[in-house]
UniProtKB/Swiss-Prot annotation:
GO molecular function: rRNA binding; structural constituent of ribosome; transferase activity
Function summary: One of the primary rRNA binding proteins. Required for association of the 30S and 50S subunits to form the 70S ribosome, for tRNA binding and peptide bond formation. It has been suggested to have peptidyltransferase activity; this is somewhat controversial. Makes several contacts with the 16S rRNA in the 70S ribosome.
InterPro entries on file: NA-bd_OB-fold, Rib_uL2_dom2, Ribosomal_uL2, Ribosomal_uL2_bac/org-type, Ribosomal_uL2_C, Ribosomal_uL2_CS, Ribosomal_uL2_dom3, Ribosomal_uL2_RNA-bd_dom
Coiled-coil region(s): none
Record keywords, A-Z: Ribonucleoprotein, Ribosomal protein, RNA-binding, rRNA-binding
Record's GO cellular component terms: large ribosomal subunit
Name of this chain's protein: Large ribosomal subunit protein uL2
Superkingdom as given in the UniProt entry: Bacteria
Gene3D superfamilies (UniProt xref): 2.30.30.30, Nucleic acid-binding proteins, Ribosomal protein L2, domain 3
């Protein structure tokens, strides 16, 4: 998919850059693979805000996407590629030889009419899923399971991928886009290829209204609040906040480590690259 640039006939279109989705399916999704979805507005079951700056936006329908790919050795034909409002990647509708329909994450270079299959004996081509132990070292993969049978968790958003860099003693080593090197069980499934829609990172929203369509509300800084609202609030005139950056609840931000799962620390060989 290419990027769409616009003539500046309005102020908001001057810098707008969007993904051209003209090649995607323009109809409705398969009804049996969808479910209604209620907007929470960032509130929990007590009505309290647990995720700030969320609310509004276009009504969405949830699509059931198969992240497990456990229907082994049954070829499926790609019927079409579709837009999914719940994720940045595109999804593909596939039809198995026995007639079952399913949605999967669409990898790059997958198109209608292609045949995909999952299983240990599948070919190494985009869209095919198999255990990491059956994938050659150096292959680009996505939708990687962290536990066998739990469904893919790693490399699922638009344009992402990982690389299988080694196999040893029943474990597979994978290198993530962040630079992290970690191991997972060799029985875990992964799908060959990189996730579709790599141009998603080049989108320029262009105007506040488009953010509202996506359910994003205005984000205001702590230094413009009152002391009752934020640790950076208050002061006479414009201030810098007067302290190292913290969250509204007083915890350090900007690089503060929050990982606490020591049980799986041994599965991370090298931590991700730090930002500048």
């Amino acid at each position: 998919m290419a990027l769409k640039h616009f003539n500046p006939v309005t102020a908001s279109l001057r810098g707008t850059v969007l993904v051209d989705r003209s090649e995607l399916w323009k109809g409705k999704p398969v009804k049996t693979l969808t479910e209604g979805k209620h907007s929470t507005g960032g509130r929990n079951n007590h009505g309290r805000i647990t995720s700030r700056f969320r609310g509004g936006g276009h009504k969405q329908t949830y699509r059931y996407v198969d992240f497990k790919r456990r229907k082994a050795d049954v070829p499926a034909t790609v019927e079409r590629l579709e837009y999914d409002p719940n994720r940045t990647a595109f999804i593909a509708l596939i039809k198995y030889q026995d007639g079952e329909l399913s949605y999967i994450l669409a990898p790059q270079r997958l198109k209608a009419g292609d045949v995909v299959v999952s299983g240990a004996r599948a070919d190494i081509k985009p869209g095919n899923a198999m255990p990491l132990g059956a994938i050659p070292v150096g292959t680009i993969i996505h939708n990687i399971e962290m536990k066998p049978g739990a469904g893919g968790k790693i490399a699922r958003s638009a344009g992402t991928y990982a690389q299988l860099v080694g196999k040893d003693a029943g474990y597979a080593q994978i290198k993530l886009m962040s630079g992290e090197l970690r191991v997972v069980r060799a029985e875990c499934y992964a799908t060959v290829g990189a996730v579709s829609n790599p141009d998603n990172s080049n989108i320029h929203i262009g105007k506040a209204g488009r953010s509202r369509w996506l359910g994003r509300r205005p984000h205001n800084r702590g230094v413009v609040m009152n002391p009752v609202d934020h640790p950076h609030g208050g002061g006479e005139g414009r201030t810098s906040g007067g302290r190292h950056p913290v969250t509204p609840w007083g915890k350090p931000t900007k690089g503060y480590k929050t990982r606490t799962n020591k049980r799986t620390d041994s599965l991370i060989i090298r931590r991700r690259n730090k930002g500048k």
